């Protein structure tokens, strides 16, 4: 946020009447000007400093949840989102366990913060995600056509409900193609689905190169300040919108969608350009990806965007945090392919490249605003998904957001 703070002396603020100046001859004007200059020079020093303050993310603390932590007979891991309930001072974290280790679920937890440090995290409950009929979601082994892929969860305090994203599935080389459309569900306090948002047909799975890519759909969700709009963002481009992020290109577009909470209808779509993949994979032709792993509404039509890049044979991931602005972005709902151009995209500005923190950064997939710090600045917490992998960690990163106006 740019702030201007300009202070002038009283002489600089004087407003001479136009008619008075008109009565003066050139000599009088010259003498008056000389007096003005001398008076200004003899007055106290004038500050004309322009303060240009950009938002800054400063790391305060890092906390790791031990590998294979067990709670209520569930394996804690795969934490793919985090959301803060200010009234109860608790957090909700969804697991992307596809009912493989334990039934699909989310956790309620208390995170104790003192002196800008995370003292500990205490899990309060593990709540199972359930289908419309109240039954649990099956594992891939039991029913690959109904197995969920939970990725993001937000708490809707106005109705005490949860909104969560299911990435769906697209396996066309299976003995029988498995196509499960991505979905955004609304669940009650017991985790049971009661409703869902209306997903435009362009986001439906297809056996051909059309629609979403596998594991590239709704990875991120966020509610606006007034809790009447929901934002969702694709992790990767639709087939129609062009190639995935490459090593050196910057032509990959993903779609950000705004939904009406009351009607569940899509309202508008925006185009957001993701960065190239950061590191070359090893070997060079191995898998690589960069995409949006989470978003967080930040007020005034701005969004915190988490971009995560990963390459086979390299360190776990590179994570960059952007402040995106869609105030003047075009509605691309009617554009069938973003490769044609002719639209105004969401703008973005880098807040932090976590590579430069000098610490191990794992697979960051969740972000939320936390409690206000004592100095009044917002705090932010990020969480990483360890993929239930011993070589990865479930991290909580605690940040202060400076120079930020909501």
What are these regions, as identified by a protein language model?
Residues 13, 21-23, 35, 89, ...:
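Short linear sequence elements within intrinsically disordered, low-complexity coil regions
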Residues 8, 35-38, 148:
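Generic signature of intrinsically disordered, low-complexity, basic-rich segments
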Residues 1, 18-53:
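Bacterial Sec-dependent N-terminal signal peptides
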């Amino acid at each position: 946020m740019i702030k201007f703070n300009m202070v002038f002396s009283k002489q600089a603020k004087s407003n001479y009447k136009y008619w008075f100046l008109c009565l003066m001859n050139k000599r009088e004007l010259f003498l008056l000007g000389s007096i003005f200059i001398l008076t200004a020079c003899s007055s106290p020093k004038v500050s004309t400093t322009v303060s240009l303050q950009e938002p800054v993310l400063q790391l305060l603390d890092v906390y790791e949840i031990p590998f294979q932590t067990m709670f209520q007979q569930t394996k804690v891991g795969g934490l793919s989102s985090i959301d803060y309930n200010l009234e109860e001072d608790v957090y909700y974290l969804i697991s992307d366990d596809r009912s493989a280790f334990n039934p699909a679920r989310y956790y309620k937890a208390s995170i104790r913060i003192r002196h800008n440090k995370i003292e500990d995290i205490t899990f309060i409950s593990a709540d199972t995600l359930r289908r419309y009929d109240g039954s649990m979601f099956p594992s891939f082994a039991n029913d690959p056509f109904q197995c969920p892929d939970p990725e993001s969860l937000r708490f809707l305090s106005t109705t005490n409900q949860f909104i969560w994203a299911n990435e769906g599935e697209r396996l066309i080389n299976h003995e029988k193609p498995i196509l499960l459309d991505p979905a955004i569900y609304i669940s009650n306090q017991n985790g049971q689905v009661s409703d869902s948002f209306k997903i435009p047909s362009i986001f439906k799975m297809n056996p051909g190169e059309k629609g979403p890519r596998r594991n590239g759909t709704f990875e991120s969700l966020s509610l606006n300040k007034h809790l009447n709009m929901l934002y969702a963002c694709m992790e990767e481009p639709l087939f129609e919108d062009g190639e995935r992020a490459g090593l050196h290109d910057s032509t990959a577009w993903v779609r950000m969608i705004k939904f009406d909470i009351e009607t569940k209808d899509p309202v508008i779509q925006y185009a957001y350009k993701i960065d190239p993949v950061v590191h070359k994979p090893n070997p060079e032709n191995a898998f690589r990806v960069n995409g949006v792993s989470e978003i967080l509404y930040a007020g005034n039509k701005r969004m915190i965007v988490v971009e995560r890049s990963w390459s086979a044979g390299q360190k776990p991931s590179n994570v960059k945090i952007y402040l995106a602005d869609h105030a003047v972005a075009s509605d691309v709902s009617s554009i069938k392919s973003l490769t044609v151009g002719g639209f105004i995209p969401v703008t973005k500005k880098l807040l932090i490249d976590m590579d430069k923190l000098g610490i191990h950064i794992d697979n960051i997939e969740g972000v939320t605003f936390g409690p206000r710090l004592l100095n009044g600045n917002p705090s932010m917490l990020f969480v990483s998904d360890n993929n239930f992998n011993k070589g990865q960690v479930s991290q909580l990163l605690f940040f202060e957001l400076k120079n930020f106006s909501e």
